[in-house]
Regions:
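Short amphipathic beta-strand starts and helix->beta connectors
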Residues: 1-4, 80-84
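Vicinal oxygen chelate
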Residues: 2-7, 14-22, 64-71, 88-105, 107-174
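Long, hydrophobic N-terminal alpha-helical segment
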Residues: 2-52, 57
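Extended intrinsically disordered, low-complexity coil regions enriched in Ser, Thr, Gly, Ala
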Residues: 25-46, 90-94, 102-127, 172
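A cross-kingdom feature marking solvent-exposed beta-strand/loop segments within repeated
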Residues: 44-60, 81-96, 126-146, 170-173
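Ordered, amphipathic secondary-structure segments that act as subunit-interaction surfaces
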Residues: 70-78
Length: 174
C-alpha cells in the first residue's frame, strides 16, 4: 500500500529515543562506561490491558532512562508479554526502536494521521501520580500519560511514539 499524500501533523518537542535491549544491566553498563551516559533511573512497569495490534494485551517492561540535555535515552527490556518492543527485538535485534514526541490533542492528531494511512499499533495509559497529595488531601484529578506507537513499516522501521500528559478525573470505588 502506498502512503497517501499527508496533511502535515505538527508534533511537539522531542522527548526521547527508545532503544530495545535484551539485558538491561549490560546495556546500562555499556552506555554508561562507553558513552558516559547516566545516571540511569530504572523502573519496572506492569502494563495491564493495553491495545496492541487490535487486541487487548498485558506486559511487564523494565525501562531505564538517562538524560542527555533536554532529551532522554530510554532503554527498554520486555520481561513478559508481547509488545512493539518484543516484535522489534525478534525481527531486527537490539537497537533504536522509537523516537518519541510530546503532543497535545492526541486523538485529533491520530484522526489526521489516519487520513494519511498512518495507524497506531500500540496504545497504553500510565497513571503518573497518586490521587492523594502530600498533605493527604484527596485530589479530584490525577495525571495520566497516554503513549501511542505508530506503524512504521512504510517509513523505515523506526516507530514514532506520541505521548500526551493529561489531567483525568479520579474515580472512587463505590
Amino acid at each position: 500500500m502506498q502512503l497517501k499524500r499527508p496533511s502535515m501533523v505538527t508534533l511537539g518537542k522531542m522527548s526521547h529515543v527508545g532503544i530495545v535491549v535484551r539485558d538491561m544491566d549490560k546495556a546500562v553498563e555499556y552506555y554508561g562506561s562507553v558513552f558516559g551516559l547516566g545516571p540511569f533511573t530504572t523502573e519496572v512497569y506492569d502494563l495491564k490491558s493495553f491495545a496492541y495490534r487490535g487486541k487487548t494485551a498485558s506486559a511487564r517492561v523494565k525501562a531505564a532512562i538517562a538524560y542527555s540535555g533536554p532529551v532522554f535515552i530510554e532503554l527498554v527490556q520486555v520481561l513478559e508479554g508481547e509488545t512493539v518492543h518484543t516484535e522489534f527485538l525478534r525481527e531486527r535485534g537490539e537497537g533504536l526502536q522509537h523516537v518519541a514526541f510530546l503532543v497535545r490533542n492526541l486523538d485529533e492528531k491520530l484522526k489526521e494521521l489516519a487520513k494519511s494511512g498512518v495507524e497506531p499499533v500500540m496504545r497504553l495509559r500510565i497513571p503518573i501520580d497518586n490521587p492523594a497529595d502530600q498533605a493527604g488531601t484527596a485530589k479530584k484529578t490525577r495525571l495520566e500519560l497516554t503513549e501511542v506507537y505508530l506503524d512504521s513499516d512504510k517509513i523505515g522501521g523506526t516507530m514514532i511514539q506520541l505521548m500526551e500528559f493529561k489531567e483525568v478525573p479520579v474515580t472512587c470505588p463505590e
